[in-house]
């Protein structure tokens, strides 16, 4: 029976272009997993959207001389275009200015307040006497209280990933004027996170998290304290009973997963469809995020869900990446350590980029993109192993007139059957890797299967068999090689969708109805009918070069 699967990626801030680090961290892994679950035949909904409130946006919009809505509209389109170019197979890309979001945020707030989990408190906050206003989050910078980095933001350190209040910074100053800030009393609404420690620990104990994430978040939850969920800004969702205050972006943003699903349901003219994913406990919910978003997704948002009465689906698995670097340093457009996505894709194929990002994904530790590694992986793995196996077999078949290959039990020898069994074993291993969210191991399985195919072809040497007049034996070897290629395309599809589709198109297997499949959302192939070798027929087409060498 198919499972219902809800997949979300962290909502990207609508305040700048996406870089390779973002893609390798939260978006390519989610896309790969969504494609894998569709192949299994599951009912998948992959949701994301722009995060359009918060101080980072007001700060950059003011610097750009643009209105806030104009600014987020611009980056919403840029992000959507980027995801389209990268073939991130989102079912819907929403935004936190969608028509459902405001009312939903207000409902969360009202429910949490009615249960005594939100209360107004007076506290000391950072104030700029020069600018005559309170400043917080990214309007503030200073020295990180954890690692000592000077230039840390007011809500998190971009160097070590620490999460804190702006008042925790050492020597805080205004991001705009550079002036020293003072502490001044003001009133804000506070979420009593410390009252949610036990429910959160119980929830985390039942959820799937990578061990490095689990260790961090358990310690984090044990030290929770009340947290302000309001800000003194003009851009944001107004707090219903608190004049001149808006909600803190990390209170409203995660609710965007739910409102974004409502937005999707409206777009498909089935306004109640969102409930199948958010109000059904049987739904499997997997979140993909970056390292710096762990506290908000593993503690604050679950606390918001647990603290109110509507049984919204809580995440079953939280997949968090570490940092992805460029040549050993953080991606930074202002510092020149940056790759223009459009220019890169004008030079190199999309699947080459997807493969290298997957093979070097920062799954359990920081990793990096380097041009030397990109070139090496493309040429030695995609061209030397993968592409070579496909092209040599299909080119030989066409040159020697083998247009249709049909399974014949009598023509298969023990070594052929062992080869097919070994191929099936690797496919099963790939399934396990995808199921456990490991792109790196999936890439290894892809190359292992390609290498197995090359070894088989080398050992059987169909060119020699042909010279010896053993055409029936050549046909058996080519059939087995093509069957392996069909499986190779299957396990490659989540990472290399364009390449996999080309392979299937050249093989034209009887077991795959290409006409009735959407090549961007191939569904229900990972099943016994597709694997059944006894009924398979290949109607080969003229081969096309799959992978070109990177100079």
From Swiss-Prot:
Cofactors demanded by this protein: Zn(2+)
Motif stretch ('KMSKS' region): 330-334
EC number in record: 6.1.1.10
Matches recorded under CDD domains: Anticodon_Ia_Met, MetRS_core
Biological processes per GO annotation: methionyl-tRNA aminoacylation
Pfam families in the record: Anticodon_3, tRNA-synt_1g
Keyword set includes Ligase: yes
Membrane-spanning ranges: none
Gene Ontology CC entries for this record: cytosol
Main location: cytoplasm
Co-factor binding details: Binds 1 zinc ion per subunit.
UniProt motif 'HIGH' region: location: 12-22
Family membership: Belongs to the class-I aminoacyl-tRNA synthetase family. MetG type 1 subfamily.
Cited PANTHER family: METHIONINE--TRNA LIGASE (PTHR45765), METHIONINE--TRNA LIGASE, CYTOPLASMIC (PTHR45765:SF1)
Summary of the function given for this chain in its UniProt record: Is required not only for elongation of protein synthesis but also for the initiation of all mRNA translation through initiator tRNA(fMet) aminoacylation.
NCBIfam families assigned to the protein according to its UniProt record, in alphabetical order: metG (TIGR00398)
Subunit structure: Monomer.
Protein name listed in UniProt: Methionine--tRNA ligase
Organism in which the protein naturally occurs: Chlamydia felis (strain Fe/C-56)
Gene expressing this chain: metG
């Amino acid at each position: 029976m198919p499972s219902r699967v809800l997949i979300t990626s962290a909502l990207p801030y609508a305040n700048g272009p996406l870089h390779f680090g973002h893609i390798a961290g939260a978006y390519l892994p989610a896309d790969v997993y969504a494609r894998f679950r569709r192949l299994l035949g599951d009912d998948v909904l992959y949701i994301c959207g722009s995060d359009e409130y918060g101080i980072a946006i007001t700060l950059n919009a003011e610097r750009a001389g643009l209105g806030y809505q104009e600014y987020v509209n611009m980056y919403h389109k840029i992000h959507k275009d980027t995801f389209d170019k990268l073939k991130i197979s989102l079912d819907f890309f929403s935004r936190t200015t969608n028509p459902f979001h405001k009312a939903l945020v207000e409902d969360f707030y009202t429910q949490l307040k009615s249960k005594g989990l939100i209360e107004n408190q007076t506290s000391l906050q950072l104030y700029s006497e020069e600018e005559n206003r309170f400043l917080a989050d990214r309007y503030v910078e200073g020295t990180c209280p954890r690692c000592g980095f000077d230039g840390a933001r007011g809500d998190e350190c971009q160097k070590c990933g620490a999460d804190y209040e702006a008042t925790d910074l050492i020597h805080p100053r205004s991001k705009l004027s550079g002036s020293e800030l003072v502490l001044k009393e003001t009133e804000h609404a506070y979420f009593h996170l410390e009252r949610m420690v036990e429910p959160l620990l119980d929830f985390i104990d039942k959820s799937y998290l990578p061990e490095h994430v689990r260790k961090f978040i358990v310690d984090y939850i044990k030290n929770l304290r009340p947290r302000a969920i309001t800000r003194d800004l003009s851009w944001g969702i107004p707090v219903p009973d608190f004049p001149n205050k808006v909600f803190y972006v990390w209170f409203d943003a995660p609710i965007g997963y739910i409102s974004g699903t409502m937005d999707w349901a409206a777009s498909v003219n089935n306004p109640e469809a969102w409930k199948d994913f958010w109000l059904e406990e049987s739904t499997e919910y997997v979140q993909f995020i970056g390292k710096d978003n762990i506290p908000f997704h593993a503690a604050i948002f679950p606390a918001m869900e647990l603290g109110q009465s509507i049984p919204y689906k809580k995440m079953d698995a939280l997949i968090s990446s570490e940092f992805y670097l460029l040549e050993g340093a953080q991606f930074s457009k202002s510092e020149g350590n940056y790759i223009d996505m459009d220019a890169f894709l004008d030079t190199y194929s999309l699947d080459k980029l997807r493969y290298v990002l997957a093979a070097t994904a920062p799954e359990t530790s920081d990793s990096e993109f380097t041009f030397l590694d990109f070139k090496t992986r493309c040429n030695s793995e995609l061209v030397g192993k993968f592409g070579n196996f496909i092209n040599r077999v299909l080119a030989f078949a066409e040159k020697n007139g083998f247009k249709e290959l049909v399974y014949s039990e009598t023509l298969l020898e023990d070594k052929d059957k062992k080869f097919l069994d070994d191929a099936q074993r690797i496919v099963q291993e790939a399934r396990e890797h995808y199921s456990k969210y490991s792109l790196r191991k999936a890439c290894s399985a892809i190359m292992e299967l390609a290498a197995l195919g090359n070894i088989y072809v080398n050992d059987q040497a169909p060119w020699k068999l042909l010279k010896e007049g053993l055409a029936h034996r050549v046909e058996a070897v080519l059939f087995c090689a093509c069957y392996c290629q069909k499986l190779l395309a299957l396990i490659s599809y989540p990472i290399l969708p364009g390449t996999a589709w080309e392979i299937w198109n050249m093989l034209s297997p009887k077991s795959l109805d290409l006409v009735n499949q959407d090549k961007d959302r191939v569904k229900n192939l990972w099943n016994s009918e597709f694997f059944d070798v006894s009924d398979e027929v290949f109607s080969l087409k003229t081969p096309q070069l799959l992978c070109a060498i990177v100079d």
